[in-house]
């Protein structure tokens, strides 16, 4: 089955009432009409995909390659460009727009974004480990625990202090509560990855119940 997709920007969270009176937490995603920047085919690119662009880039940040690429679609360079695979290429034409009506209430989607960055953190905050005793002469408070049975080797994957967050994450099987075509907004049930004002990619769910 062909998938659909659209790019947007996370606005924030709110809550809405459904028709039966249920209060549902939703994430508001701005989906200002995307522009089809490129249509990739097996013959020309080795795979099928449609390239979408969201949000105009400031002119001072553009360069000649980005301007030339956008010119083929009769548009301006975009801030956020991503590809959507497994789509029906016949539904897309270079330079056309993809709007909020791409999805409807009740659709199940996967949302990909960049999680909030927390910088360099220790085991307690990063991995949820327990701290040591804080009194009675203990000299072990927030340090990592044992590194394993072999004294001169640290096994791959060992949880140690390091950078936390700022990873690409996908939340699957989220429900579209409403699609507001007048204000170019999608309301998605629950939360989606990333901070407010961060870019997200919304695709038809790959594991949705059939």
Curated annotation (Swiss-Prot):
Record function comment: One of the primary rRNA binding proteins, it binds directly near the 3'-end of the 23S rRNA, where it nucleates assembly of the 50S subunit.
Keywords per UniProt: Ribonucleoprotein, Ribosomal protein, RNA-binding, rRNA-binding
The name of this protein is Large ribosomal subunit protein uL3
Gene Ontology terms: biological process: translation
Question: What organism is this sequence from?
Answer: Lacticaseibacillus paracasei (strain ATCC 334 / BCRC 17002 / CCUG 31169 / CIP 107868 / KCTC 3260 / NRRL B-441)
What Pfam families does the record point to? Answer: Ribosomal_L3 (PF00297)
* Cellular-component GO terms for this entry: cytosolic large ribosomal subunit
Q: Read off the InterPro entries from this record.
A: Ribosomal_uL3, Ribosomal_uL3_bac/org-type, Transl_B-barrel_sf
């Amino acid at each position: 089955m062909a998938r659909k997709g659209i790019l947007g920007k996370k606005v924030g969270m709110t809550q809405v009432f459904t028709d039966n009176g249920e209060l549902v937490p939703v994430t508001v995603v701005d989906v200002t009409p995307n522009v089809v920047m490129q249509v990739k085919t097996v013959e020309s690119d080795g795979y099928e995909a449609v390239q979408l662009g969201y949000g105009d880039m400031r002119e001072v940040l553009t360069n000649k390659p980005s301007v030339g690429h956008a010119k083929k679609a009769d548009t301006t360079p975009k801030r956020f460009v991503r590809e959507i695979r497994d789509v029906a290429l016949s539904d897309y034409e270079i330079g056309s727009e993809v709007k909020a009506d791409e999805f409807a209430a009740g659709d199940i989607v996967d949302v990909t974004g960049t999680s909030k960055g927390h910088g360099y953190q220790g085991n307690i905050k990063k991995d949820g480990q327990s701290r040591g005793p804080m009194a009675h002469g203990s000299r072990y408070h927030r340090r990592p625990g044992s590194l394993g049975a072999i004294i001169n080797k640290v096994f791959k994957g060992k949880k140690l202090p390091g950078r936390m967050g700022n990873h690409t994450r996908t939340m699957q099987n989220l429900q579209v509560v409403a699609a507001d075509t007048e204000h170019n907004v999608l309301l998605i049930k629950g939360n989606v990855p990333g901070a407010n004002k961060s870019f997200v990619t919304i695709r038809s769910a790959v594991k949705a119940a059939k």
